[in-house]
Amino acid sequence: MNIPQEVARRRTFAIISHPDAGKTTLTEKLLLFAGAIQIAGSVKARKASRHASSDWMEIEKQRGISVASSVMQMEYRDCVINLLDTPGHQDFSEDTYRVLTAVDAALMVIDAANGVEPQTIRLLQVCRARNTPIITFINKLDREVREPLELLSEIEGHLGMDTVPFSWPVGMGKAFGGVFDIRRNRMRIFRAGQERRGEDDEFIDGLDNPEIPRRFGAAFAQASGEIELINEAAPAFDREAFLAGKQTPVFFGSAINNFGVQEVLDALVDQAPAPGPRQALEREVRPDEPKFTGVVFKVQANMDPAHRDRVAFVRVSSGRFERGMRLKVARTGKEMRPNNVVSFLSQRRELLDEAYAGDVIGIPNHGVLQLGDVLTEGESLRFTGLPFFAPELFQAVEVKDPLRTKQLRVGLTQLGEEGAIQVFRPEAAGGALLLGAVGQLQFEVVAHRLKTEYGVDARMMPSRYTSARWITSDDPRALRKFMDANAAHIAYDVVDAAAFLITSPAQLRVAEDLYPNVKFHALREHGGKVFGDKA
């Protein structure tokens, strides 16, 4: 099959939600319905020692939360689906942001009892800024939840996009009878059960079929009235508006009971876009170009703790990848010939021989590749959009056993390079390493990973710093003067970019007034010392 045909088969999307909306459960059920796994792991089923396929890190299994991003590839209806499961905890929004740069669509999961929640709004803002198409799944209809019309109104009000229901619930909670497929004009009858795949589901055709009101009475009377209202007042589905991120198809269901999952999976194949062109600084890169390009959007250390490995996750942007091909790392100009390249089902890997635009491949390496690196067959290209945001929380870190100092530095270097935490090395001699984060849980996860993956028992201590700004200047002498005058507040990150550590907003304002030739940046791009001014 040629490159354009293979690209047309690809669907690459991320699942996003507020914590506990059921994102991990839906991820599992999509894998189950696509035939990628035989049994769906329940995050809550501790006694059965069964964990979600996408929650593979030890701390995730202990707490039942997603703190790393997982990549899973599966085939369904002659399409190759690349599913990226994002961190569910809000403290890891930076990793989620990076994942959203690697996808062509997003599946938004909303808890029908809670509606649109803060983390959902933040993630949707990122999707809207990138015009990412969004499919919405309103989950947990088998529980006591809010009215569906109210939920649609909230989505439109908070997220600024039109909703187009593809299905509609008949009843809710204990009275949940199923969902009516508006486009196919039939009702799928709800049956509880976590291992069903829908082959034996019961359907009733036609909104005017007397069998439905006979069985579901008042619940259907309300639902049919709402469906008629939707058919009259709601906008028709416009795929161009959907692809522009202005309209979202909406599905209702219960992921834990495998209900409504089939419709979502079909919509991803039928409506989500194949990979499109990507804009580099130098030119537009089209997916069906003959030559390979790819971007490192994630680096993960110790996916296999037994081998202490580091895997670079590369989104293929164009062309065809072949195992052993000669590639150039644009940032360094160095050449590499990766042979042990893998595809993923969470932490399980398989060697692959080829990949196409939209696919995510894993390249094991020992620090050669960094976040934001661009791989090509020789061309020098730069992609932006993978930022480090200025941290808002700081802690100093020391090792309890001085003999493990080297292991601490190795561990923090690797965790810093993968973006799990930001690591700052003070310019002043003798200063403890500083960790910067956007949420408290990041510190806990790093301490846990240092202990379990590197054998380092680290001590975290409070820090007086509240933020940081990377500093540059067109005048090297002006920059050096500022750094000398503020030596106690200067530190270097993992790529040796200088940063000004701040104790209060007033301190930053004073510095900006006193040193007009120095630029203070709230973000730094991955893949080198490229800076921006807005976080």
Curated annotation (Swiss-Prot):
Subcellular location: Cytoplasm
Sequence ranges assigned to domain tr-type G in this UniProt record: 8-278
Keyword Cell wall biogenesis/degradation attributed: no
Keywords: Cytoplasm, GTP-binding, Nucleotide-binding, Protein biosynthesis
Primary site of residence: cytoplasm
CDD domains for the chain: RF3 (cd04169)
Gene3D superfamilies for the chain: P-loop containing nucleotide triphosphate hydrolases, Peptide chain release factor 3, domain III
The organism's place on the tree of life at top rank: Bacteria
UniProt binding sites for GTP: 17-24, 85-89, 139-142
GO cellular component: cytosol
GO biological process, one term: regulation of translational termination
InterPro entries on file: EF-G-like_DII (IPR053905), EFG_III/V (IPR035647), G_TR_CS (IPR031157), P-loop_NTPase (IPR027417), PrfC (IPR004548), RF3_C (IPR032090), RF3_dom_3_sf (IPR038467), RF3_GTP-bd (IPR041732)
GO MF term set: GTP binding; GTPase activity; translation release factor activity, codon nonspecific; translation release factor activity, codon specific
Protein role: Increases the formation of ribosomal termination complexes and stimulates activities of RF-1 and RF-2. It binds guanine nucleotides and has strong preference for UGA stop codons. It may interact directly with the ribosome. The stimulation of RF-1 and RF-2 is significantly reduced by GTP and GDP, but not by GMP.
Family: Belongs to the TRAFAC class translation factor GTPase superfamily. Classic translation factor GTPase family. PrfC subfamily.
PANTHER family assigned: PEPTIDE CHAIN RELEASE FACTOR RF3
Name listed for the protein in its UniProt record: Peptide chain release factor 3
Gene name, Swiss-Prot/TrEMBL: prfC
